[in-house]
């Protein structure tokens, strides 16, 4: 009886799946949108490229073939037009409806709570963001600048000086991980990891870096819960444990910070505690958000810095111009600070161009259209459609940028010959009321570190890092070692 049922069920499943594929291709409300037939038939097309780490390149290829909107799944549309940022991620208005976050993409943390980025209700998110917002304001950042400078000075005058004396190639990504995680640990919880002192990762950070490589697998298993049970081998038990350990380590640090006096500690948690509505977040909510900040507050900065250095090393004239701007603008290193760096036009142009070519988040985060549909870039998109801007593809599109694959910082300067570029297509920190809350902090950390490095040292490329930017994403970049050398100026 069991065998007979099994032989009967399998054809039914096959017939049902085949009928669904035919419907998706020929009858589905999205059938008129261009894209591969296989992508229209099944969501597994999208997940094949995602799990392979090459979805960003495949999306770029498809947009070159089909234009500014592509159907990348049965219920999934990818956009690259600049207007899509506002239409997809912007707030609701009287003339345009709001798209909500996709619950099939954003999972709760292992403690069952949702961090700010994964809150599905936009009003709830707005309430939580208001509590955290003062901690990430320019005023707070200026108050925290001495904390940042303490670690940056150690990086400049201890770690890099030793490496300059050794005159051997070293992995800049590893060194930046040590520096940025030390800074973020101090900024968030008044306790550095001490990794610059050791020039090595502590267990928590090793755990986190391993867990990040399996983020795409986790999202796949979330979306295909039943199928995921059959494919659980995609995420080894050790990777699951690493993710859980990251949350546990974060919780332990938060609990330790909670026991300290707010009056004696100046950090993000101190600003949070001072907010009149801080009590809306219980300890489990704080654990979840601290886990988020330890990733979002570090990964974007490390990615942007390493990408900027690589691109400058690949383009010596740009490096020479930036070095000249920095060294001509300051008479001493201590004059390099948050306020003075904002006025360096070529530095900011180089940073904008690096973020265009190597955005820290190469894929747009999905939203879902309301039940009665929405209008995106002039297209009437049916309800319950998953929509997003493919960041990397948008920034590499010839329809948005001239010399789209070339590092051209001058495109961000006046009268550069790139006035026809659709620069608003590049939104490395997203757009709208749910954009990156730590954008200002990231920009400052990037500026202060690259400016002080180039004020003190000459950077040299190592042959081992040729082709470094050809990376996979899961969905964040899987960064390889970036081997460089430094010399005292």
Swiss-Prot record:
GO molecular function: heme binding; iron ion binding; monooxygenase activity; oxidoreductase activity, acting on paired donors, with incorporation or reduction of molecular oxygen
Transmembrane segments: 292-312
Annotated Gene3D superfamilies: Cytochrome P450 (1.10.630.10)
Disruption phenotype: Produces smaller amounts of AM-toxin than the wild type but still causes lesions on apple leaves.
Cellular localisation: Membrane
Pathway: Mycotoxin biosynthesis
UniProt EC number: 1.-.-.-
GO biological process: biosynthetic process
Entry cofactors: heme
UniProt entry keywords in alphabetical sequence: Heme, Iron, Membrane, Metal-binding, Monooxygenase, Oxidoreductase, Transmembrane, Transmembrane helix, Virulence
Inducers of expression: Expression is up-regulated more than 10 fold in toxin producing cultures.
Keyword Transmembrane helix: yes
Binding site for heme: 436
Protein topology in the membrane: Single-pass membrane protein
Major localization listed first in the record, in broad terms: membrane
Additional free-text comment from the UniProt record: Gene clusters encoding host-selective toxins (HSTs) are localized on conditionally dispensable chromosomes (CDCs), also called supernumerary chromosomes, where they are present in multiple copies. The CDCs are not essential for saprophytic growth but controls host-selective pathogenicity.
Family from the record: Belongs to the cytochrome P450 family.
Name assigned to this protein: Cytochrome P450 monooxygenase AMT3
Gene transcribed to yield this protein: AMT3
């Amino acid at each position: 009886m069991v065998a007979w049922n099994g032989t009967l069920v399998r054809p039914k499943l096959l017939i049902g799946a085949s009928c669904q594929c035919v419907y998706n291709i020929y009858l589905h409300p999205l059938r008129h949108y261009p894209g591969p037939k296989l992508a229209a038939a099944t969501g597994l097309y999208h997940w094949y490229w995602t799990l392979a780490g090459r979805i960003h390149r495949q999306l770029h290829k498809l947009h070159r073939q089909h234009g500014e909107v592509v159907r990348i799944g049965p219920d999934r549309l990818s956009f690259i037009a600049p207007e899509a940022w506002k239409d997809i991620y912007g707030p609701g208005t009287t003339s345009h409806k709001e798209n909500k976050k996709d619950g099939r993409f954003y999972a709760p943390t292992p403690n069952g709570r949702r961090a700010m980025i994964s809150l599905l209700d936009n009003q709830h998110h707005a309430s939580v963001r208001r509590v955290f917002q003062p901690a990430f304001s320019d005023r707070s950042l200026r108050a925290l600048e001495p904390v940042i400078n303490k670690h940056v000075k150690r990086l400049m005058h201890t770690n890099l000086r030793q490496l300059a004396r050794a005159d051997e190639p070293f992995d800049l990504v590893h060194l930046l991980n040590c520096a940025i995680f030390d800074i973020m640990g101090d900024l968030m919880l008044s306790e550095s990891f001490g990794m610059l002192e050791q020039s090595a990762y502590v267990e928590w950070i090793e755990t986190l870096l391993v867990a990040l490589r399996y983020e795409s697998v986790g999202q796949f298993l979330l979306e295909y819960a039943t199928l995921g049970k059959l494919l659980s081998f995609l995420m080894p038990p050790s990777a699951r444990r690493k993710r859980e350990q990251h949350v546990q380590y974060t919780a332990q640090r938060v609990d330790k910070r909670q026991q300290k006096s707010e009056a004696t500690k100046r950090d993000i948690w101190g600003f949070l505690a001072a907010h009149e509505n801080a009590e809306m977040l219980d300890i489990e909510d704080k654990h979840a958000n601290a886990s988020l900040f330890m990733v979002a507050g570090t990964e974007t900065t490390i990615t942007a810095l390493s990408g900027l250095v690589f691109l400058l090393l690949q383009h010596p004239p740009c490096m020479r111009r930036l070095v000249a701007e920095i060294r001509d603008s300051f008479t001493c290193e201590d004059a390099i600070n948050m306020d003075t760096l904002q006025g360096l036009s070529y530095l900011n142009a180089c940073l904008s161009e690096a973020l265009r070519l190597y955005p820290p988040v190469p894929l747009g985060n999905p939203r879902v259209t309301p039940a009665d549909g929405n209008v995106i870039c002039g297209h009437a998109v049916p309800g319950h459609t998953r929509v997003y801007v493919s960041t990397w593809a948008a920034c590499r599109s010839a329809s948005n940028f001239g010399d789209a694959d070339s590092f051209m910082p001058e495109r961000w300067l006046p009268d550069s010959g790139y006035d026809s570029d659709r620069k608003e297509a590049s939104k490395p920190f997203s757009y709208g009321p749910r954009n990156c809350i730590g954008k200002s902090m990231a920009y400052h950390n990037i500026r202060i570190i690259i400016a002080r490095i180039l004020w003190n040292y000459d950077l040299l490329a190592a042959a081992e890092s040729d082709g470094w930017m050809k990376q996979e994403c899961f969905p964040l970049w899987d960064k390889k070692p970036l081997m460089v050398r430094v010399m005292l100026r």
